[in-house]
Design a protein with these regions (language model features):
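Divalent metal-binding segments
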Residues: 1-175
């Protein structure tokens, strides 16, 4: 719950342009190299736009322009796909020549370039780089992030009249 408050909420985006705008705002306040995360986009909710698409989804060109120095990773509402900019693909070593993983697809344009759309198991290619990025954080940075997540979750719960909750799936290290 707290983690969801730290990333871009893309559930209300009515166009790909809305998503690009949210990423641009996040990139303006992010340090170079800092990852930008989001979740909840769904192309069927978008108004038609005059932009390049492959298989009904825009390419990552617009996001590359607004966040050239920040890897961007945006998970589809279903969780079965994700959208990555070129910085995220580079961090993961994904190119147009990268083989599709078993059970996944790296969507490519007519020239064979990766468009940024990763389906199913192809998401794991970039998620491995995200795990490496998080592992590079100091223990103090990870602790601060967890503290912020708990604080944000508590604030959201209180705003809805929920005064207590627990998570039986969290280990003692995270508590």
């Amino acid at each position: 719950l707290g983690r969801a408050q730290q990333i871009l909420d893309l559930t209300q985006a009515q166009s790909f342009g809305d998503i690009v705008s949210q990423v641009a705002v996040a990139a303006d306040s992010a340090e170079p190299g800092q990852w930008i995360f989001g979740r909840g986009w769904h192309q069927d909710k978008w108004q038609p736009e005059d932009i390049d698409t492959v298989e009904g989804v825009p390419t990552n060109k617009s996001i590359n322009q607004v966040a050239p120095d920040n890897p961007v990773y945006l998970v589809h509402a279903s969780g079965h796909a994700a959208f990555a900019n070129d910085a995220a693909l580079r961090a993961a070593g994904v190119t147009g020549a990268t083989d599709d993983p078993t059970g996944g697809t790296i969507v490519r344009d007519a020239q064979g370039r990766a468009t940024g759309l990763l389906r199913e198991n192809a998401q794991k290619l970039v998620e491995g780089s995200i795990a490496e990025y998080i592992a590079l954080q100091t223990p103090a940075q990870r602790q601060q992030s967890l503290h912020e997540q708990v604080e944000l979750a508590g604030q959201l719960a209180l705003a809805h009249g929920i005064t207590s909750f627990h998570d039986a799936g969290v280990g003692f290290d995270d508590i």
